[in-house]
Curated annotation (Swiss-Prot):
Family the UniProt entry places it in: Belongs to the AcsF family.
Function: Catalyzes the formation of the isocyclic ring in chlorophyll biosynthesis. Mediates the cyclase reaction, which results in the formation of divinylprotochlorophyllide (Pchlide) characteristic of all chlorophylls from magnesium-protoporphyrin IX 13-monomethyl ester (MgPMME).
Cofactor annotation: Fe cation
Organism in which the protein naturally occurs: Bradyrhizobium sp. (strain BTAi1 / ATCC BAA-1182)
Name of this protein: Aerobic magnesium-protoporphyrin IX monomethyl ester [oxidative] cyclase
A Pfam family this chain is assigned to: Rubrerythrin
Alphabetically ordered keywords of this record: Bacteriochlorophyll biosynthesis, Chlorophyll biosynthesis, Iron, Metal-binding, NADP, Oxidoreductase, Photosynthesis
Iron in keyword set: yes
Catalytic activity, EC: 1.14.13.81
Recorded superkingdom: Bacteria
Gene name of the encoded protein: acsF
Pathway(s): Porphyrin-containing compound metabolism; bacteriochlorophyll biosynthesis (light-independent)
Length: 353
């Protein structure tokens, strides 16, 4: 452990408070609609998922060991900064889920749904707390109480919460398990002990995603008609955001020994394969135009960052024009043909990747 750095904790909190298209957000929703949810259509599989959550297999997993005391300042500067960004972003995403799930639990009486969100908020609080303790060990902890009070909240209808959080949980599983498997193959690249925790950690994310899959399959209209267009939108938004964000951490992925595009493709494949359990449409991630569009979005995002740094009149003009270019690029990506998927009779999956 190292001494607290003056103001460092505030810097981490400011990072977590950032509201951009690339940063994790806090959400609120229609709690009355949540209270009316009915899972009778998937009762057998629902009870099985709830039994797993009730068992709390990871209740003793998130305990730091002495190896966590290694000074982050021993890392090369670029890697240290990007790893810190990775931790703060991960913490914000986990804590966002914790806040939303806890609020849903507090505001509803439906016993099935209330029990689910009780367990999921428990898990997300545990994840966020574990990351924050690591940050605090190095004098850069995030003030979670302050974050709860001042972070902007975005309202989503329940169906949008389901689409977004299902993808967030499943892509979180895919990201963590991909890094964990890489560390299994190349232990010499494990520059921080947190990666050893990722296998069991990501199983929590997987179980949460299973619950959201069942909530959607319990209401077939969420997966038909015009809602297919919304599903395609959320798939593209989540994949595109991840791709752009990952390219902002080149030193991090170099240290892991995984080129960003290779890592992203692996995560996209796992997430797409898993989402066949619930989504009737899939993105064609093997279409060369899909990757060309993602790379164009990345370049526009980099140009926007450069324009902000440039300042002045020209910088302001670029900041006004470039988001339009990003929107057009996203629109072209959205218009690419998607793949149809026939939903399986059995919904539940096991984390076998």
């Amino acid at each position: 452990m190292i001494a607290m750095e003056g103001g460092a904790g505030n810097i981490s909190t400011k990072m977590a408070l950032e509201d951009t298209i690339l940063t994790p957000r806090f959400y609120t929703t229609d709690f009355a609609a949540m209270d009316r949810l009915n899972v009778d259509l998937v009762r057998r599989e629902w009870d099985a998922v709830m039994a797993e959550l009730r068992a709390d297999h990871n209740r003793k997993h998130f305990v730091r060991t002495p190896e966590f005391e290694k000074d982050l300042n021993e890392l090369p500067e670029a890697l240290r900064l990007e790893f810190k960004d990775f931790l703060v972003s991960s913490l914000t995403a986990e804590f966002s889920g914790c806040v939303l799930y806890a609020e849903i639990k507090k505001r509803i009486t439906n016993p099935d749904i209330r029990e689910l969100f009780s367990y999921m908020s428990r898990d997300e609080a545990r994840h966020a707390g574990f990351i924050n303790e690591i940050l605090k060990d190095h004098g850069i902890g995030v003030d979670l109480g302050f974050l709860t009070k001042v972070k902007k909240y975005t309202y989503f209808k329940p169906k949008f919460i389901f689409y977004a959080t299902y993808l967030s949980e499943k892509i979180g599983y895919a990201r963590y398990i991909t890094i964990y498997r890489q560390m299994e193959r190349h232990p010499e690249r494990q520059f921080h002990p947190i990666f050893k925790w990722f296998e069991r950690w990501c199983n929590d994310e997987f179980r949460h995603g299973e619950a959201f899959a069942l909530l959607m399959r319990a209401d077939p209209k969420l997966l038909s008609g015009l809602n297919k267009l919304w599903i395609k939108f959320f798939l593209l938004a989540v994949f595109a955001t991840m791709h752009v964000r990952d390219h902002m951490r080149p030193a991090f992925y170099e240290a892991l020994g995984m080129p960003v595009d290779e890592y992203d493709m692996r995560v996209f494949r796992i997430t797409s394969e898993i989402s066949r359990q619930v989504f009737p449409v899939m993105l064609d991630i093997d279409n060369p135009r899909f990757w060309a569009g993602l790379n164009q979005l990345r370049k526009v995002s980099e140009a926007i960052a450069d324009a902000k740094a440039q300042g002045g009149v020209m910088g302001a003009i670029k900041r006004a024009v470039l988001p339009l270019k990003a929107a057009l690029t996203f629109g072209r990506l959205y218009m690419l043909p998607a793949k149809s998927n026939e939903l399986p009779r059995e919904i539940r999956l096991q984390p076998a990747w």
